[in-house]
Swiss-Prot record:
Effect of R121Q: In NSDVS1; gain-of-function, reduced BET proteins stability
Region listing for Required for nuclear localization, in residue ranges: 71-191
Top-level lineage group: Eukaryota
Protein known as: Speckle-type POZ protein
Cellular component, GO, one term: cytoplasm
Lineage: Eukaryota, Metazoa, Chordata, Craniata, Vertebrata
UniProt-listed SUPFAM superfamilies: POZ domain (SSF54695), TRAF domain-like (SSF49599)
Domain notes: The BTB (POZ) domain mediates dimerization and interaction with CUL3. The MATH domain mediates interaction with protein-ubiquitin ligase substrates, such as MACROH2A1 and BMI1.
Similarity field: Belongs to the Tdpoz family.
Primary subcellular site in the record, as a coarse category: nucleus
Length: 374
């Protein structure tokens, strides 16, 4: 649940008159999402009104509101027999009622949201009550392989729920002597030191190019640089560091992050930047690179990204790559990247197969709970 924001200063709310007192009302909304995959969808019983329910879910471990999704594969009634019906059901509720908006969509073979439908307002739910769409999607369109909505005969539904909580009022009075504290510009100011090479005390040599930097900042941000300058190493004695395995453009992006906490060109060089972040123990930059690479996972590059993640101990990226390969196994196994990995990294192939087997055979063990970014 997000923290209630402070109200904007009255002088910034309007260029008009300023009242002596004010009130700011925040209506709290808890948002969460749920993904439900139905394997072997074409084998569902086709009687009209037949119901399939998901397991229950909530916004978190401490949330007492429990929900589930309900599907009628062949419609709810005679009117909707040519459609799939989809509903959000409130299973248990400690209150007399709650209000919530919802959005349903289908994830296609690429994991993209399609055929989205959402409620136009927050509906009133009581325990045992459901709301949804009797005519969510035509069955003939859903079952047509050309539309790519049932890869490997799996129907994957994605649901986003927004639950309306209580409202909170914050009130106060205006004073004539309003003090406005300026925003912190530390990142910009440190970035200026790097860009202008002011007050530098060490030189970093990268592929024949020299960059002036500040030992204190490098040591504070990177345990690797800290070790170089702290001990009686040649880098500490000469205040000069030779860097041979990072390209200059990648190095500059890494230094921008060290000084400012930002990497504006990360998406263009996420793979190389991940390697640099791993070498210099820049954990936050490493996770930022993992996130960017996750966003660009595809059938063509899944094997290469899995190898990269394994090489640099990028655990979150590795998990996402394995899950992606499992979901698109029939396509990924035909790529040149996968065939190369079979020869060069057989242990990763074995890991992917083990994960695929456990996903398809849940009876082999208890269900695993899916539970950071600093």
């Amino acid at each position: 649940m997000s923290r209630v924001p402070s109200p904007p200063p009255p002088a910034e709310m309007s260029s008009g008159p300023v009242a002596e007192s004010w009130c700011y009302t925040q209506i709290k909304v808890v948002k969460f999402s749920y993904m439900w995959t139905i394997n072997n969808f074409s084998f569902c019983r086709e009687e009209m009104g037949e119901v399939i329910k998901s397991s229950t879910f909530s916004s978190g471990a401490n949330d007492k509101l429990k929900w589930c999704l309900r599907v009628n594969p062949k419609g709810l009634d005679e009117e909707s027999k040519d459609y799939l019906s989809l509903y959000l059901l409130l299973v248990s509720c400690p209150k007399s009622e709650v209000r919530a908006k919802f959005k349903f969509s289908i994830l296609n073979a690429k994991g993209e949201e399609t055929k989205a439908m959402e409620s136009q307002r927050a509906y009133r739910f009581v325990q045992g009550k459901d709301w949804g769409f009797k005519k969510f999607i035509r069955r003939d369109f859903l079952l047509d392989e050309a539309n790519g909505l049932l890869p490997d005969d799996k129907l994957t539904l994605f649901c986003e729920v927004s639950v309306v909580q209580d409202s909170v009022n914050i009130s106060g009075q205006n004073t004539m002597n309003m003090v406005k504290v300026p925003e912190c510009r530390l990142a910009d100011e440190l970035g200026g030191l790097w860009e202008n090479s002011r007050f530098t005390d060490c030189c970093l040599c990268v592929a024949g190019q020299e960059f002036q930097a500040h030992k204190a900042i490098l040591a504070a941000r990177s345990p690797v640089f800290s070790a170089m300058f702290e001990h009686e190493m040649e880098e500490s004695k000469k205040n000069r560091v030779e860097i041979n395995d990072v390209e200059p453009e990648v190095f500059k992006e890494m230094m921008c992050f060290i000084y400012t906490g930002k990497a504006p060109n990360l998406d263009k060089m996420a793979d190389d930047l991940l390697a640099a972040a791993d070498k210099y123990a820049l954990e936050r930059l490493k996770v930022m690179c993992e996130d960017a690479l996750c966003s660009n996972l595809s059938v063509e590059n899944a094997a290469e990204i899995l190898i990269l993640a394994d090489l640099h101990s990028a655990d979150q990226l590795k998990t996402q790559a394995v899950d992606f390969i499992n979901y698109h196994a029939s396509d990924v196994l035909e790529t040149s990247g996968w065939k190369s990995m079979v020869v060069s990294h057989p242990h990763l192939v074995a890991e992917a197969y083990r994960s695929l087997a456990s996903a398809q055979c849940p009876f082999l063990g208890p269900p695993r709970k899916r539970l950071k970014q600093s």
